[in-house]
Amino acid sequence: LSSRPPGAASGYLVVGEGGVVREAGEAEVSAGTTVEVRDLFFNTPARGKFLKSPATEQGAILRVVTQLTLAHADVHVRLTANGRLVLNAPPARTPRERLGALYGFGLAAKLLEVSGESGGVRLLGVVAPPSVSRTHRDDIHLIVNGRTVRDTLLTQALIEAYRPLLPRDQFPLAVLVL
């Protein structure tokens, strides 16, 4: 883990191996924060046996990083795997901008902005028109107080709102921030 605030002369570096901190202190590092993970289960091979294929595990990591990226649109997020850039999302001012970096700006241009306030709760976000649907619920993103959440009740409410507009096996794409 390395981190340096913009404009600072130096940053901080922490290197851990096998649950032990090998190095920690001030260091010359790039601006921003970098988390690098290598050989995660080198000293616990039994854990490695439960891993799926590398592609499946990388997909799971990408889903988690995508959720974090949506929840923190003001942060530049870059994900590399095996030396290849998998995700690059510069800071964004709106959920639409962030989704553009993640899913493509052509899709982001089709999204509909939503907002509302009731009882002290404010909602804003973007939803896809019925012509842009998915065969899974993975692209329904709910962010509450800066954290991504999986909430069956909120997800089901969104799906029910779309029910008259989508076939039974199709789901909306949405980012809703509460």
Stretch-by-stretch model annotation:
Residues 1-178:
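N-terminal phosphate-binding caps/lids of nucleotide- and nucleic-acid-binding domains
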